[in-house]
Amino acid sequence: IYAGCSAGAMILGREIPDFRTMGMRSFSAFGVVPVAFVMPHFDAIPLFAKPLASALRNRLKPGEIMIGVDEDTAIIGKFNEDWTVFGKAKAHVFTKTESKSYSAGEKFSLGN
């Protein structure tokens, strides 16, 4: 079992974006969750930083996923099983070409 919030959630993906370069570079992360990037506080990203999410999405390769998790929200799941959204807001799952948002109680797959 692992719980992470904010930076503790970001480190679960494969990479952590370098905010100083607006996502053009990144640092290796733990790769515990089968996604390229985990973006916490997704609904609270300030307007000036919105291009970061676009830059990260553009870096995704076919089959890769980026997750945005809103504030006061969590996703809980296991490998090879669906993940469930808990909390007040939504979780957002992005590929390079598609996006889908899930509310509390909804389930989604990370394609694993």
Each PLM stretch: what is its role?
Residues 1-15:
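Catalytic nucleophile loop
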Residues 16-112:
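C-terminal and late-domain segments of enzyme folds
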